[in-house]
């Protein structure tokens, strides 16, 4: 398959979405069931949503929630999905809350189709706002943006808030990523019931797909989750809308905001590569003019 050195260039990708309980074993079982369903539908690479082992605890700043973090090495969920990936011959990016000595990260382990752990990506952009208080729990990632060569394709994986930054997508594609994946946890805004970001959310990522001429897969959770905070209860209704976009940004598969789902789409990566080269987007780049992107204030210092 493309990117992995094998024959052929057609790759099937999947996004799954489901409602999370606060019982880890139930969520991991659900993820496995849906991965198996995606495999039956022909998927080679299957994306599960962000932090799927439990409910989205970042609604609150609570010390007890640090107990949910686990080390990368020896992580039982990663080991379980390594076995599953090998059995089904599918690639699985596994999202988890990582403890690394005194640091904590929002991380994804990339599991290849033979069960090999290809490495780790740690979320780079950490949000901090009502209902999404991730800076309390997570250090900014230190891995940098990566492209992982799997059996079926070279892939790039960003995590949730990363998806709002075009620099993240471009950096992964520049390193050879043929498909972009974004595990996500996004829904209503506790401070403003009238704010609905789902269409904006989709359009931003559709832009990444179109600007880089690569397919893109986003997996989001569904369901209403209430967490006890230091100020009372906080509730988010996660809006699902997991989707798969084609290389011009067109949505080819879309889930709704309420139902568990498994989306699968096939892409010919050789054909997409030829189109990408033909457009000249990467030929005509001017990195010498982009130094301003390395600043916070736009000054050319």
UniProtKB/Swiss-Prot annotation:
Entry's EC annotation: 3.5.1.53
Keyword Secreted recorded: no
All residue ranges annotated as the CN hydrolase domain in the record: 11-269
Keywords associated with the record: Hydrolase, Polyamine biosynthesis
GO molecular function, one term: N-carbamoylputrescine amidase activity
Family matches, as InterPro entries: Aliph_Amidase/BUP, C-N_Hydrolase, C-N_Hydrolase_sf, N-carbamoylputrescine_amidase
GO terms for biological process, alphabetical: putrescine biosynthetic process from arginine
Catalytic activity: N-carbamoylputrescine + H2O + 2 H(+) = putrescine + NH4(+) + CO2
Tree of life domain: Eukaryota
Pfam short name (any one): CN_hydrolase
Coiled-coil zones: none
Active site location: 50 (proton acceptor), 123 (proton donor), 160 (nucleophile)
Pathway of action: Amine and polyamine biosynthesis; putrescine biosynthesis via agmatine pathway; putrescine from N-carbamoylputrescine (amidase route): step 1/1
Protein family membership: Belongs to the carbon-nitrogen hydrolase superfamily.
Description of how the protein assembles with itself and partners: Homooctamer.
Function in brief: Involved in polyamine biosynthesis.
Name used for this protein in its record: N-carbamoylputrescine amidase
Organism annotation: Oryza sativa subsp. japonica
